[in-house]
């Protein structure tokens, strides 16, 4: 659990995204927020580095409460499961969902709290943060929701089960 006070100042330029310019027009260049945060993690994997069975769960919530200039919330949940198919093969399934929005007088989730996808932790094969809505200049601006799924088939190399695994994956 946590509580903080954040002051964010934003400068825009001619080539700034229209969504950023609109956010500044709606909320001003400088904003104070009072975020409350809560995180919960449950780790039931049989190994930290090379799991073959078990689960990992994480839930996170951030709420910017009244008293600051902006009021919003952002929540996310992740569930990861490992299944031993044989001594050498492990199946890993991972799912993540996230959603954020504003409430009260705040018009939208601040753009700097948006969700992004792409990169080694979400959709491999894409540059980090490169997937999602784009501005007119082709820059990824993120969004207020995200759904990510990953499937991996992991193969422990004989004689090196505790140090090396190869994997085939599919991410969406």
Q: Model regions: which residues?
A:
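C-terminal outer-membrane beta-barrel translocator/porin domains of Gram-negative envelope proteins
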Residues: 4-163, 168-172
């Amino acid at each position: 659990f946590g509580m903080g006070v954040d002051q964010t100042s934003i400068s825009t330029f001619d080539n700034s995204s229209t969504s950023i310019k609109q956010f500044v027009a709606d909320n001003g260049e400088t904003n104070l927020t009072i975020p409350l945060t809560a995180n919960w993690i449950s780790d039931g994997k049989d190994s930290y580095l090379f799991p073959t069975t078990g689960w990992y769960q994480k839930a996170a919530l951030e709420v910017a409460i009244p008293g600051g200039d902006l009021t919003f919330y952002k929540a996310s949940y992740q569930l990861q499961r490992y299944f031993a198919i044989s001594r050498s093969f492990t199946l890993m399934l991972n799912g993540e969902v996230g959603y954020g929005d504003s409430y009260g007088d705040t018009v939208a989730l601040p753009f700097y709290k948006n969700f992004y996808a792409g990169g080694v932790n979400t959709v491999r094969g894409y540059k980090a943060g490169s997937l999602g809505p784009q501005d007119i200049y082709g820059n990824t601006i993120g969004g207020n929701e995200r759904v990510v799924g990953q499937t991996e088939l992991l193969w422990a190399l004989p004689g090196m089960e505790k140090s090396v695994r190869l994997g085939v994956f599919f991410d969406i």
